[in-house]
Design a protein with these regions (language model features):
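Active-site acidic/histidine clusters and adjacent loop/turn architecture
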Residues: 1-35
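Residues at alpha-helix termini
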Residues: 29-30, 52, 98
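Glycine-rich loop at the start of a catalytic domain that most often binds anionic cofactors/ligands
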Residues: 48-55
Length: 134
């Protein structure tokens, strides 16, 4: 079993301040009870998740520190797994306003996920083709 990284310090240096601001807005300004579940993933963890059917990719934005997963809790402190409270939508809209991609918009919804890569592909990132980020 691989380690699960939850701290924002494990995110890519370009994403850390964005994620910190997002977390502050969601928690402090909007009053949403939430926490970060996972930031950076190593390859072993990604393989585990793919085998378990919890990820569809061999390599993704988590593997380069440009994605995070989070959980929201309703007013009773109950973990909201399907956005019935609308809290994930609020957090997702904040992420999108900051230039992020929110998993709640995908065909296979991933409400508690967002990634920040400013319009470039993972391959461009891996190839070092994005100035100022890599």
């Amino acid at each position: 079993m691989s380690d699960i990284h939850r701290d924002l310090e494990f995110l890519h240096a370009s994403f850390q301040p964005v994620a910190e601001t997002w977390l502050h807005i969601c928690k402090d300004d909007l009053g949403i009870e939430m926490r970060v579940l996972e930031t950076l993933r190593d390859e072993d963890r990604q393989v585990e998740l793919k085998r378990a059917g919890k990820s569809q990719v061999k390599l993704g934005w988590h593997n380069v520190g440009l994605a995070l997963d989070f959980a929201c809790f309703d007013e009773k402190g109950v973990y909201d797994t399907d956005n019935h409270s609308g809290l994930y939508t609020k957090c997702g809209l904040v992420a999108e306003a900051m230039g992020g991609v929110w998993g709640g918009r995908w065909r296979m919804r991933d409400y508690g996920h967002w990634e920040w890569h400013e319009g470039f592909t993972l391959q461009q990132f891996l190839d070092g083709g994005k100035k100022g980020v890599v």
